[in-house]
């Protein structure tokens, strides 16, 4: 069964795309970030946007899929949780059809982004640095779910999607990561 879903953000969303520059620093190489000018806060944030070549913002489909999987922690099938720390039943019965989910401003228009600057803790060192990331205050998206109804009924998938928006969230500093950003509500639900 195909379900067309429309979501609207109830809190701003913060993006933090993993760039090639980040990969170099993680794998032990050197990068411009380590050895030279980092650029303006806006230039730093611009590199972290999920945006296509025309500059249109999007949410990666795998991010929405991971959000659904993590929402499974709040649901049980029989005596077992749908998602545990090591496994989940969600991938066997639900998929997000789009690889790239275009964002809107929640009203059908193009979303605008601002620079969100705040300190972050580097887990490996415990040190603090300033991080400049893109923040979209008004946002929404439309995507499709392919659901195996032998595994999951549409009303269960709706509860899962509602919990994903309230308790898990999307992108950086979301509720699942002890933050307030990336929360959403389902505003459209069409079963085909």
PLM region descriptions:
Residues 1-192:
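RNA-interacting cores
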């Amino acid at each position: 069964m195909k379900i067309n879903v429309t979501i609207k953000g109830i809190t701003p969303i913060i993006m933090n795309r993993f760039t090639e520059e980040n990969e170099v620093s993680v794998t032990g190489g050197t990068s411009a970030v380590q050895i030279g000018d980092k650029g303006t806060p806006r230039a730093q944030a611009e590199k972290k946007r999920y945006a296509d070549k025309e500059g249109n913002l999007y949410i990666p489909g795998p991010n929405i899929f991971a959000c659904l999987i993590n929402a499974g922690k709040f649901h049980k099938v029989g005596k077992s949780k749908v998602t545990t720390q090591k496994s989940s039943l969600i991938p066997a019965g639900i998929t997000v059809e789009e690889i790239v989910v275009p964002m809107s401003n929640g009203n059908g228009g193009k979303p605008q982004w601002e620079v969100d600057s705040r300190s972050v803790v580097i887990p490996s060192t415990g040190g603090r640095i300033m991080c400049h990331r893109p923040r979209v205050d008004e946002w929404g998206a439309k995507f499709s779910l392919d659901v195996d109804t032998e595994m999951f009924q549409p009303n269960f998938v709706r509860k899962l999607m509602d919990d994903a928006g309230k308790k898990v969230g999307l992108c950086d500093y979301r509720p699942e990561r002890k933050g307030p950003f990336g929360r959403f509500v389902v505003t459209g639900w069409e079963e085909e």
